[in-house]
Amino acid sequence: MTTGKIVQIIGAVVDVEFPQGEVPRVYDALNVVDAQERLVLEVQQQIGGGVVRCIVMGSSDGLRRGLTVENTGAPISVPVGTKTLGRIMNVLGDAIDECGDIDAEEHYAIHREAPSYEEQSNSTELLETGVKVIDLVCPFAKGGKIGLFGGAGVGKTVNMMELINNIALQHSGLSVFAGVGERTREGNDFYFEMQEAGVVNIEKPEESKVAMVYGQMNEPPGNRLRVALTGLTMAERFRDEGRDVLLFVDNIYRYTLAGTEVSALLGRMPSAVGYQPTLAEEMGVLQERITSTKQGSITSVQAVYVPADDLTDPSPATTFAHLDATVVLNRNIAAMGLYPAIDPLDSTSRQLDPLVVGQEHYDVARGVQSTLQRYKELKDIIAILGMDELSEEDKQVVSRARKIEKFLTQPYHVAEVFTGDPGIYVPLKDTLAGFKGLLAGDYDDVPEQAFMYCGKIEDALEKAKKL
């Protein structure tokens, strides 16, 4: 095992000098020998003259020049397999839940090749979420990649928690949750909610259904940059065993941001909006590995923060290209008090095709979108001239669109605590029946307020009797 010496420390980036013939390879893990606690460096560049530039996987406080560093000769490797279930780990795969060490038989390196074309498989099997607006307008595919796009405070994490609740609890498979640069409180809430739901079993961890990997907001950029790969590596191991895995990543934007933080320190010229020049490649390396093979599938749900609500920002724009379904959250819908604040006109899915979802579903979804689009166009006229100036046909469109907007809302299980309304899971056939009736004009005489926060159309009719 070769050793070197620290020669320079710039925040999260450290230069280490090795003897000329024994320079570590890029992505090799190095251990700092004299550090108070375990500290790992990951090689990013070979500068020349035996010096390598590394990212610190932890806090660089207390490091000084001249400390001895050992080369492990291999990339960072993390525990994989059933021993990780029910546990909370950090970027290095060390347990941080105070329930003892993880004695896994197998460890995988976090840097791995994406599956080849021959190994990949594509599926058109739909994944029902029980959320009306998603199942109708942007249906998810089993083994697909889903992105939840939204600015600050419009409900990305709540929507993700509801999807975990509806999919992970109904689906008997395993899940991996990667918390990338998000609030520690949310990770804590998630852990305790999973315990209450029986998905995490502290007494018998091997009976748990979820593994959690956290690198939160307060962590150095090295942790946030690599923690998504740690979670993905664990999910890949379950997939290769022939299981169907759910991978939840909250938040993919922080992964990009961590790359931006270290990029300048590594001496790269910034590109558009100050992002790293390697943005597309870094995103591709992660996303290409999140895929389904002939052995098993990985269905991933990723929250994507949209800076300043600008979907053309390079980070969300780069993410768009990799996804099968995009769920776009809209601040204006949230401001109207309509939750989930998912925009049915902006959200898209490759599965919304008559050959996949069937002609009836396709027609209902497009009918809902065209009604809402027409209402959007008429809003300016209504604002200036009022409703009275519209033709009878347009008045009918406006009335139906307002009912559709209200009927797209529904109470969430995870929001019960602060709304007081019990959550509702709506099967797809009930969703289609409700919207089909609304488009056909079967409920033109029902007051629009009856459609707010109800599940099936029958619930709305019950509510209307009480109004």
Swiss-Prot record:
Highest taxon of source: Bacteria
GO annotations of cellular component type: plasma membrane; proton-transporting ATP synthase complex
Binding site for ATP: 150-157
Catalyzed reactions per annotation: ATP + H2O + 4 H(+)(in) = ADP + phosphate + 5 H(+)(out)
Major subcellular location class: membrane
Membrane topology: Peripheral membrane protein
First-level EC class: translocase
Gene3D superfamilies the UniProt entry points to: 2.40.10.170, Bovine Mitochondrial F1-atpase, Atp Synthase Beta Chain, Chain D, domain 3, P-loop containing nucleotide triphosphate hydrolases
Subcellular location as annotated: Cell inner membrane
Keyword vocabulary terms for this entry: ATP synthesis, ATP-binding, Cell inner membrane, Cell membrane, CF(1), Hydrogen ion transport, Ion transport, Membrane, Nucleotide-binding, Translocase, Transport
GO terms, molecular function: ATP binding; ATP hydrolysis activity; proton-transporting ATP synthase activity, rotational mechanism
UniProt xrefs under Pfam families: ATP-synt_ab (PF00006), ATP-synt_ab_N (PF02874), ATP-synt_VA_C (PF22919)
EC number(s) per entry: 7.1.2.2
NCBIfam families named among the record's database cross-references: atpD
Quaternary organization: F-type ATPases have 2 components, CF(1) - the catalytic core - and CF(0) - the membrane proton channel. CF(1) has five subunits: alpha(3), beta(3), gamma(1), delta(1), epsilon(1). CF(0) has three main subunits: a(1), b(2) and c(9-12). The alpha and beta chains form an alternating ring which encloses part of the gamma chain. CF(1) is attached to CF(0) by a central stalk formed by the gamma and epsilon chains, while a peripheral stalk is formed by the delta and b chains.
Role, per record: Produces ATP from ADP in the presence of a proton gradient across the membrane. The catalytic sites are hosted primarily by the beta subunits.
UniProt record similarity statement: Belongs to the ATPase alpha/beta chains family.
Protein name, entry field: ATP synthase subunit beta
Species whose genome carries this gene: Aliivibrio fischeri (strain MJ11) (Vibrio fischeri)
